[in-house]
């Protein structure tokens, strides 16, 4: 059975490249978040976590930061979902390169926008639920989401 074999050596390089792409997107997201913070609340850091919470929740600038930050974060999450929803399973399952894996993922999302949007919401809900108990729940949520992603990939790509 293909799912039980160890990672093929040719796939390791492609998986590494895909990971680096996602790492670059993460770095861009951090830069965007820092920029949004600076533009809305100013360049100075708060003196405490409670001061930060007060500034964010009780000022117009704080609510602007929340709204803009959530919108930008949603766009980053959407890009990550689109390029990676079937990329990693495809790289593990077949001998394809990163470009083809990303193109296949984009095509899968384009051809199945409703189910893929639902899957994105399920992933988000699973991660939130796993994070609530001091991140310990992620030890349960991540393997379940990974297994379900494999089945989604098999159903969508075949």
What is each residue range found by the language model?
Residues 1-158:
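Hydrophobic alpha-helical membrane segments
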């Amino acid at each position: 059975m293909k799912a039980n074999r160890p990672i093929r050596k040719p796939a390791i390089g492609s998986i590494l490249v895909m990971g680096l792409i996602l790492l670059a997107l993460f770095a861009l997201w951090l830069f965007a978040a820092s920029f949004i913070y600076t533009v809305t609340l100013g360049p100075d850091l708060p003196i405490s976590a409670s001061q930060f919470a007060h500034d964010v929740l009780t000022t117009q600038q704080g609510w602007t930061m929340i709204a803009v930050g959530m919108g930008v974060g949603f766009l980053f999450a959407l890009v990550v979902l689109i390029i990676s929803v079937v990329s990693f399973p495809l790289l593990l399952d077949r001998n394809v390169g990163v470009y083809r894996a990303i193109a296949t993922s984009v095509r899968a999302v384009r051809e199945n926008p409703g189910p893929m949007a639902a899957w994105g919401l399920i992933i988000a809900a699973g991660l939130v639920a796993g994070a609530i108990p001091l991140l310990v729940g992620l030890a349960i949520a991540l393997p379940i989401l990974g297994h379900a992603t494999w089945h989604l990939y098999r159903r969508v790509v075949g």
